[in-house]
Amino acid sequence: AARATVNNAFYTSPEIAMCINSALVQFGFRGGNVLEPSMGIGNFFGSMPAPMQRSKLYGVEIDSISGRIAKQLYQNANISITGFENTTYPDNFFDVVVGNVPFGDYKVFDPKYNKYNFRIHDYFLAKALDQVRPGGMVAVITTKGTLDKANPTIRKYLAERAELVGAVRLPNTAFKDNAGTEVTADILFLQKRERKIDIEPDWVHLGVTENGIAVNSYFAEHPEMMLGSMEYDTRIYGQDSRYTVCVNNDENFNMYETLNKAIGNIKAQMTDFERVADEAEQTEEVIPACLLYTSPSPRDRTRSR
């Protein structure tokens, strides 16, 4: 499927990619099978700290120019120049999925997921969760719509399959220097559950900020995880706008320092275990994977139903 926007992963700054990768190391990740499903030229691969560099890298990029550049830059990685919907990776294969998923108000044709009617960014999250193993981590940038939209369907879907270990809301200027655009986006850290469960934690639903703006309950309860304040965007949509953006007008604001501080609030522990290679991998080196353990999170409090 064609994208409405061009190569979001290309425009992810190396600094943001490094912050996300460093979070995985902070959690204890020390290498395994890593997928970037919308990789652009591979800024996440190029920003891996030393402990992650022993990983086996897999990438997907629909744009042929960016994909060919990535193949040249990361010649030991398994990179496919195609849409994520065309890939056939087995479920439960990857230890970590990282990246910046494409944002857009359009859908991808994939027979396995068509019944959910997901927008492209939510589709990427759903498929990534299937392909990461139980206990694995999906650490991706997505539009704020995933957490803030009024319809909770995607959040209910994700919550049944993963714990939201943590999230950080970026200000709308986070991609301005690299992409020339202002967009409010979130970094999500999702740990896949051992099995699907019927659960409805607070973050499936919306709350309000101190100034009465609708926002995901996670951010209403943890405003320190927003790198700015939520406002109505009246510049584009007029005085009656209900479209919200995350804004930080502090002239001394250092996004990367603040982002690292926010990520430091997220607690998770990862311990090594040895993956049993299947027949297709018997001739290859077996790379130790990492299994994520977290203590029961207060963010998974269930609502009475």
Model-predicted regions and their roles:
Residues 1-73:
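Class I S-adenosyl-L-methionine
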Residues 177-274:
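Flexible, glycine-/basic-rich loop-and-beta segments that form/coincide
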Residues 293-302:
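Conserved small/polar residues in nucleotide/adenosyl-binding loops
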